[in-house]
């Protein structure tokens, strides 16, 4: 296929047009009075969402040049989502503001490399100030406030997530399930998460989230490598095929021919199967497999137990209510074998008492925490499928934001922290930077006002007047869009996780710098022009 090549201003203008399209669609959702976006799906009902990254993923433009701009700014949202789990709309608004202002300077002769250096230095200054001004999150009230805001100012959901985190801990597993009624409920159940994911991406059932979800699966656990198709795999696949239930295989490894057989079975719809490598090493691997076996009421197939894959029967397989497998983790939810799990926990506590080395104690405590901690399951209730999808997206954002707040603390929300820090940045840049680097820092200083500006605009107010009203106010004073007044953001419960704000400015500056230093764009020709 022939290529289309654009240079200099022409290239940057084409990228800018695509960036404008995505930023406009995403930014209308920002703030408590932000609007929704309706997305027409190829299959099923249209989806109503106000989640930045979900909207960004849906935008594809006909013009390949402009679509490259869309892809670039989408990265700012995606990276922020990967690191902090929220703040994708803020990252998009910031990146767009830096790019728009930066391109004006580039077109009038400023050096893009010097601008980039200024942008990087300014973003590092802001990140440092966010860290200095963040408050540790210490009480349940603050947790509820963070989770409520990220869930679209829904206090009921905020309380539920705070309750879930209290019960399973900040590192605990919170799983979302589709409920069977219109009411959203929280259930604490037994389960376990371990740090191993699917061996092959061909097992994925949800390509949007890159995950595999198995409902009511059988679980095969073995400390052996699965290598032979006829001896190791066919017996269990034949058994599972008759049950019409999915299968999760946890093994030392699955070698090429055997893995290919599993993938073919999966793709052809014969058996819904996924394979993951067993967690841990050596004796610890065997112990962890035994823990999983006790949780799921199954047995580990190994030489020590006298069981083998050729003569396997259904009664040695474990069972679970649900299994969710990501690229690097697996979560199993099961609550029917409570007595055996409790006995196993007591056994581990006794082993802890006699353990001699600190390493051994640490590993035993890890295993105990996995079994005792359990899994918080939020059953999402909704009247329609469209509402269900929208609610699940809000809950995911809320869970991620709350965990981020516990990790790095909180700052005033609603774009307030960036507005106050931008005033400090202006003074610092005047003293420490010069020429085009100073211009780069000024770009970031102006862009830092953009999130609050957009929140005010979405509330029907003049963004410039709101930003001006915050000048010379204390750090905690900000704009409450719901009441249209200046308030103490901590007292009002309008707070953001510091990690989310930090990630948003960091990724926005990174992507914007790349766009500003672009001198040539090469894309495939549009079909109609080919």
From Swiss-Prot:
E.C. number(s) listed in UniProt: 5.6.1.7
Any coiled-coil regions, as ranges: none
Gene Ontology molecular function: ATP binding; ATP-dependent protein folding chaperone; isomerase activity; unfolded protein binding
Residues reported in the UniProt entry to bind ATP: 29-32, 86-90, 414, 480-482, 496
InterPro entries linked: Chaperonin_Cpn60_CS, Cpn60/GroEL, Cpn60/GroEL/TCP-1, GroEL-like_apical_dom_sf, GROEL-like_equatorial_sf, TCP-1-like_intermed_sf
Keyword Chaperone set for record: yes
Keyword Cell membrane tagged: no
UniProt-annotated location(s): Plastid, Chloroplast
Group of enzyme by EC: isomerase
Biological process (GO), any one: protein refolding
NCBIfam families, alphabetized: GroEL (TIGR02348), PRK00013.1 (NF000592), PRK12849.1 (NF009487), PRK12850.1 (NF009488), PRK12851.1 (NF009489)
Complexes and interactors: Forms a cylinder of 14 subunits composed of two heptameric rings stacked back-to-back. Interacts with the co-chaperonin GroES.
Function per UniProt: Together with its co-chaperonin GroES, plays an essential role in assisting protein folding. The GroEL-GroES system forms a nano-cage that allows encapsulation of the non-native substrate proteins and provides a physical environment optimized to promote and accelerate protein folding.
Name listed for the protein in its UniProt record: Chaperonin GroEL, chloroplastic
